[in-house]
Amino acid sequence: MNAKAYFAQARSLPMQIQAKTKQLQAVRALQEPLAALPEASKTLSDLAADITAEVQAYAALQRQLQTLIDSLPVPEYRTLLELRYLSGSKWEEIAEAMSMHVRWVYRMHGRALQAAQKILDAAK
């Protein structure tokens, strides 16, 4: 997996967890009318287990990404990737926090991903 796809997981997993949580809330709202059906209880517990597993996977991914980010040689790369992928900041917020123009943040992001890719390749 390349560095860009690896980091992209950090932005997509929370959305998946949020979608499943909404689904769980919808099922819980229907739970009382469906209480007589044994399948409803099983569906609810299966959904809760799925959410728990995804939250655990997300936490593990966050730890892996933090380790990778910490190994980058340039402090600005570390800051940028932490803001983008661990804090979920938007490009404009990152540019403001780092006192840079957004276009420069995009360029630096590409360079940071290249540096991260070198570390990932060396670890193989």
Which residues does each PLM region occupy?
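N-terminal interaction/assembly modules
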Residues: 1-71, 93, 114, 118-124
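Short, well-structured alpha-helical interface segments that form or flank functional binding sites
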Residues: 5, 89, 107
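N-terminal positioning helix adjacent to the helix-turn-helix/winged-helix DNA-binding module
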Residues: 61-64, 75-77, 108
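Short amphipathic alpha helix immediately N-terminal
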Residues: 72-89
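Helix-turn-helix DNA-binding module
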Residues: 87-103
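DNA-recognition helix of helix-turn-helix
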Residues: 99-119
